[in-house]
């Protein structure tokens, strides 16, 4: 297995494009992913009870298990838009299906942007009419789905599976309202692997728990969170079967794609200057370790301390104590590989030296609870003045 350069359309049988539909002032805002043959589709969605119209539609598509295309607009979330919003999402499906001679129920729709605003359907229709099946425009898709993001987020891997080279590509957006429990977070993954839809869904659901569900920027879960994975079988590999060595390799590749995308989202949190990676080990079990890791990385006090390069490890210990349901009297804690706590007792360290290390753009926090073999990670970012500025003026 190796990481390669590519786009969301690098796996065989996929195409992608994007246009400026004038939903934004000047940037690309309407993107398409198209499989040239029917593809198995898996998905995981927001747990927010107020979910967007596209989420309702896509849940049904994933339930049926097959799709040909994904269309995604930015700038307008099409959430809390009532019956008209749902009708607009269905209309978007229909327009794209007619354009590329597909069935409407084969088209997944996604939206991201401001909540409570209706889609401008004339602009959507005009934009769809401009989408094409050109092979040279796939890289544009990653730009079209952005909102407050400062950069595109992509990843590509390939591996030999079932006697063939299998490609997997991922693209995502997300910068604010990131606290998935599955933020706004959208992620799209394509692969030319041959694998049954039920196994595809099972695998994605498992991997989501240790990747996308372990990132947080601001503690808010979006109405639109969506992860979609399409597998069209065009690599012509022997079908991947659960429990086989091919399956383990496929699952590892999907985990790498999802973790890379999740970390890219965390690093690009609104106003962020640093990626924070928290590793908790020695917990009673993995689930507890992941829960504690996410609590630490989501703490506003921890996030602001990291922004200020302040080695205030007490805030980390406080976060652990708030959620631990077991005895925590033997904690070992490291910041940037510097030991600050051993057997729950403070260790002398050079605060000025550690403060300098906390100015780096990736911060690593490792907590060993010495209470079991559970291991978990979570990712987030620092909390800055810029975050407040961005969100105070978001709809202005």
UniProtKB/Swiss-Prot annotation:
Gene3D superfamilies: ArgJ beta chain, C-terminal domain, L-amino peptidase D-ALA esterase/amidase. GO terms for molecular function: glutamate N-acetyltransferase activity; L-glutamate N-acetyltransferase activity. Keywords: Acyltransferase, Amino-acid biosynthesis, Arginine biosynthesis, Autocatalytic cleavage, Cytoplasm, Multifunctional enzyme, Transferase. Substrate binds at residues 147, 173, 184, 270, 391, 396. The keyword Amino-acid biosynthesis applies. The record marks 112-113 as: Involved in the stabilization of negative charge on the oxyanion by the formation of the oxyanion hole. HAMAP family: ArgJ. The active site is at 184 (nucleophile). This is Arginine biosynthesis bifunctional protein ArgJ. The gene is argJ. The record marks 183-184 as: Cleavage. Heterotetramer of two alpha and two beta chains. Catalyzes two activities which are involved in the cyclic version of arginine biosynthesis: the synthesis of N-acetylglutamate from glutamate and acetyl-CoA as the acetyl donor, and of ornithine by transacetylation between N(2)-acetylornithine and glutamate. GO terms for biological process: L-arginine biosynthetic process; ornithine biosynthetic process. Transmembrane segments: none annotated. GO terms for cellular component: cytoplasm. It comes from Lactococcus lactis subsp. lactis (strain IL1403). It catalyses: N(2)-acetyl-L-ornithine + L-glutamate = N-acetyl-L-glutamate + L-ornithine; L-glutamate + acetyl-CoA = N-acetyl-L-glutamate + CoA + H(+). Pathway: Amino-acid biosynthesis; L-arginine biosynthesis; L-ornithine and N-acetyl-L-glutamate from L-glutamate and N(2)-acetyl-L-ornithine (cyclic): step 1/1; Amino-acid biosynthesis; L-arginine biosynthesis; N(2)-acetyl-L-ornithine from L-glutamate: step 1/4. Its EC number is 2.3.1.35, 2.3.1.1. It is found in: Cytoplasm. Its main location: cytoplasm. The keyword Transmembrane does not apply. It is an enzyme of class 2 (transferase). Belongs to the ArgJ family.
């Amino acid at each position: 297995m190796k990481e390669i350069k590519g786009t969301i359309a690098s796996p065989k049988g996929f195409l992608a494009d994007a246009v400026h539909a004038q939903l934004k002032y000047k940037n690309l805002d309407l993107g398409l992913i198209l499989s040239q043959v029917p593809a198995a589709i898996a998905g995981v969605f927001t747990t927010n009870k107020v979910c967007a119209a596209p989420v309702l539609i896509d849940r049904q598509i994933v339930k049926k298990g097959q799709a040909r295309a994904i269309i995604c607009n930015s700038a307008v979330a099409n959430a809390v838009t009532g019956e008209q919003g749902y009708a607009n999402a269905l209309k978007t499906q229909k327009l794209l299906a007619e354009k590329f001679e597909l069935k409407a129920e084969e088209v997944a729709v996604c939206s991201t942007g401001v909540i409570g605003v209706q889609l401008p359907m004339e602009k959507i229709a005009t934009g769809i009419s401009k989408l094409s099946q050109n092979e040279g425009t796939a890289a544009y898709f990653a730009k079209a789905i952005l909102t407050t993001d400062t950069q595109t987020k992509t990843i590509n891997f390939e591996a030999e599976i079932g006697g063939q080279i299998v490609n997997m590509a991922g693209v995502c957006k997300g910068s604010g309202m990131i606290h998935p429990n599955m933020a706004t977070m959208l992620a799209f993954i394509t692969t030319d692997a041959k694998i049954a839809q039920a196994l595809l869904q099972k695998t994605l659901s498992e991997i989501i728990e240790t990747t996308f569900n372990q990132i947080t920027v601001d503690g808010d879960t979006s109405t639109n969170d969506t992860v979609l994975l399409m597998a069209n079988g065009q690599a012509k590999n022997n079908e991947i079967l659960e429990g086989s060595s091919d399956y383990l390799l496929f699952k590892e590749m999907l985990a790498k794609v999802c973790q890379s995308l999740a970390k890219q989202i965390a690093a690009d949190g609104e106003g962020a200057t640093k990626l924070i990676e928290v590793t908790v080990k020695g917990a009673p079990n993995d689930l507890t370790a992941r829960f504690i890791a996410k609590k630490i990385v989501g703490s506003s006090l921890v996030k602001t301390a990291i922004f200020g390069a302040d080695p205030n490890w007490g805030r980390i210990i406080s976060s652990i104590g708030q959620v631990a349901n077991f005895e925590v009297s033997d904690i070992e804690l490291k910041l940037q590989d510097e030991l600050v706590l051993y057997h729950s007792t403070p260790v002398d360290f050079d605060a000025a030296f550690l403060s300098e290390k906390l100015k780096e753009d990736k911060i690593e926090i490792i907590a060993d609870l010495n209470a079991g073999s559970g291991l978990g990670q979570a990712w987030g970012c620092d909390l800055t003045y810029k975050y407040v500025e961005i969100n105070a003026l978001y709809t202005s």
